[in-house]
Swiss-Prot record:
UniProt keywords, alphabetically: Centromere, Chromatin regulator, Chromosome, Cytoplasm, Cytoskeleton, DNA replication, Kinetochore, Leucine-rich repeat, Nucleus, Repeat, Telomere, WD repeat
The WD repeat ranges on this chain: 426-466, 476-516, 535-574, 593-632, 659-691
Mapped LRR repeat ranges: 22-45, 48-69, 70-91
Descriptive protein name: Leucine-rich repeat and WD repeat-containing protein 1
PROSITE patterns with a match to the protein in the record: LRR, WD_REPEATS_1, WD_REPEATS_2, WD_REPEATS_REGION
Lineage: Eukaryota, Metazoa, Chordata, Craniata, Vertebrata
Single GO MF descriptor: histone H3K27me3 reader activity
Example of a GO biological process term: DNA replication
Localization per Swiss-Prot or TrEMBL: Nucleus; Chromosome, Centromere; Chromosome, Telomere; Cytoplasm, Cytoskeleton, Microtubule organizing center, Centrosome
Comment field on protein domains: The entire WD repeat region is required for the interaction with ORC complex components, as well as for association with chromatin and for binding to histone methylation marks.
Subunit structure: Component of the ORC complex.
Organism: Xenopus tropicalis
Gene3D superfamilies: Ribonuclease Inhibitor, YVTN repeat-like/Quinoprotein amine dehydrogenase
Protein family: Belongs to the LRWD1 family.
Amino acid sequence: MSKITADVLLKEGLPKSIHLKDLKKLNLSKMHLEMKDIDPKLFSQMVNLDELDISHNTLSELPDNLGLHNLRILNFADNHVEDVTVLKQFPNLEEVIYEDNIYLTVSDNYKVFCLLPKLRRLNNKDITSLANHVRFVNHRELSNRVEAHWDSKFKDNLPDKPSSQKINAVAKDFIKSVVNNIKYGPSSLKEFVRWKALGCSGKKRDSADDCTEGSPTKRTRIQHELQSIPLSPRKSNRLQNSPLSLTPIKRKQETSTQGTPSKSTETKSPKVALKSTPSKKQSNESSAKINGKQKLSLTPKIIQKALDNIEPLHFLQCHSKNNSCEDFKTQLWACAFEPILDSSSPKAVATCGGDSVCIIDCETGKVMKKYKVTGEEFFTLVWTTLTMIGKDEQKRKINVLAAGGKHGVVRIIHAKVSLCYGEIKAHKKAISIMCFSPKQDTFLFTGSYDKRIILWDIGVPDCDYNFRPSQLLTLDTTSVPLRMCLVPSCPDEFLVAACEDGCFAWDIRLDKKQGRRSYEVELNFPIYKEERKDNDFHVIDSLAFLNEDIIASKSVMQGSIYLWSWEKTLKTRKTKNVKKLDAVILAQMKWSSSETPYLVLSTSPERYCVFCGDEDGKIWIYDLDSCKADLQRGKLCSVVKEPTKILSWPILFSPKEKVEKTLINVVTVDPTMEYLVALTDINIVSIWKIK
């Protein structure tokens, strides 16, 4: 008679209930259980079971039909289990422990990586990065070797119209040959390679069964050599390979697409006192001691409100070279708000430019953290939130900041503890842009001046901050990627990038064979038809999603911002051979007639707003809430939309210089629309309070 009954399960399970279906957690450890004690009919009633502990028993195997489809954590350590392939019945497993099963080897670990797509921890260690490398990179390589083996040894053995008997005979020989001849990795993984190759050859055999004529052709692999010439990109040379000149001829003004903002929407410039030597007695002092050095910040004395509901709050010089208050030359390039982990955390924004990355408390203007690398020039940064296991074995969420720039190195920073715990030599040229996947918190895309976008799995650090990054995918671009976004409705399928020669989309699905890919489609815009000798308007310097479908983008010197539908544009593609699509424009918004490149727009999906700075220090704000319904329905708007508001740059005073206007390189707002942050070309971080 089985030791395990319904009463035993209810007694050992949590939460306490009289129904098996209510159990979330079950501990059957140290009960001397054998295989015969596990009744699948009984276990399958626990449809909501989340965690199962059957460690320290004498189980030789696990039943293959337990029906626990929602199981996330499984512990069967210290048993006698010999086969892990049975775990594929638990597709939602995130953590497995099977230490001290003496028959299980490192090859079994690799099998588990492939069988369980959501697995993140194995035997109390984070395996995210390694597992994804095995699932995708190793799988692609083994599949290619199996396919090459078929093409070179067995393809010609099949006639044009093979009989089922002939297919079976060839398939049998092929599988046997694969097992004996396909080699990959160290000898300790021999069993895994054999198992994996057997699976790949089985798929090849299945494809042969479906053939009525011919056989699969070998895939041609594209190989490119990495360029090793270093590049130090700045605003003055970022367009050196672009058809747009550095001093372009000004476009003739067109009232339908560009022009200066109307007086009714523009605010006058308030006068602001710029203090470069903070006093200890000042209540709004914004200086911070970092590594023994004083940070200078310039907090304005507000004389006049910029708008009724948006006021300038702080103007900081926290990226100065040698902490000099006279540095008005350092260019600031990127900013991002730190994700909120708890309500007590201050609203913080990370900024980068020059050789430093700063994290600033938006309310106080205090520089809380500063990370500096001598000789580096940071161009981009991005946040992600990881689940880390501490030395106490407790899970906790941490915010991690990735920053990159001129040296092509991604620096990974745990800001809360002021620790840069990792560096990834991602590219041989400068990194221009990065983004994390909203679906996979360890997936980081890096775009570079080497004309490549690379997908990395940065993994999760252990309690000693050891981590293991893995390169999963390479996307070839035809020019430098300037901005990029994952499509929100399918972030594991498509990536869209704005580049120096156009806008492109890539298929990023990792289950495809190609580990290196060119773009899937190129997006064309109406402004292209106005091409001139000095400008073809293909330099797309801004791109951001307004919701899951609508994209805001602009070309340099376009004088307007497009709102276009990703879904409607993709639907116009009749066949996969079509490589160029006309973007389906839903609306057009008037913007500055600026000739300056790299003035980046941003969006607030929560509030349906678009923000963009210009060459005069103005911040253009487009509140699209009133036309939200029309945009979501895909209704076209034939009238060029005016900005809702334009914030003017306040007149700043410092002891030696008056700053009346500047380039606004990037503008962003926090998700709750409390703060607006704008970065300039003259080493000033401006923080505005949204009332």
